[in-house]
């Protein structure tokens, strides 16, 4: 129990620090709540066990059974989604594909978030080797509402030597599904190369590919590394995202 208590305390501090850095999302909140519950359950397990021994009514047993089923379902979903996330990797890239870069947050000053900057830097490696590739930067207004992710990404690419006439903006999307759907519209409206390379974070490749198939894109995937200090939050958030896409379909 001491190990669980320490783990719960560590998780609580970790996710509080993550939120302090400005990465406030459903993954961070979930991680924080679960960590607090683990800490409390481990610290007060003797009191909890004593309380449980005094409450053995049928209603109590039913509540416990439901709780155990919910916990089992959550763990099962977590294992399945984690397996799916780990199962997809970057695959071989064709030359001069249309590059679709998926947005992931903008800082208050309009600069890309650390996660989005990793995606851009990964895309730049391919773009410098494929000078005839067109680029679609995809992402609307972030939660702060000041800058669109697409505009922030365009500015960053231009600063790093990419010509502006190669870049097409998709600045209306607010979800991965809309990223793919609206980018497909930009692709068709501008008669760009139908073979696309979707650039996103490594943890996000499964869902990006899932939606690319849904919209019948001829696609390949290129994953970027995720900063270690936000990976747990984004990983948990991605589990919700995968579940949402399954339900939406």
Regions flagged by a language model, labelled:
Residues 17-21, 46-49, 76-84, 244:
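Membrane-water interface at transmembrane helix exits
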Residues 79-235:
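A structural signal for short, hydrophobic/glycine-enriched beta-strand patches
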Residues 231-249:
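A transmembrane-helix-recognition feature enriched in membrane-embedded lipid enzymes
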Residues 4-7, 67-73, 237:
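Hydrophobic alpha-helical transmembrane segments of polytopic
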Residues 58-83:
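Internal/C-terminal transmembrane anchor helices
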Residues 2-50:
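Membrane-embedded alpha-helical segments of integral membrane proteins
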Residues 48-59:
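Membrane-helix interface/capping segments
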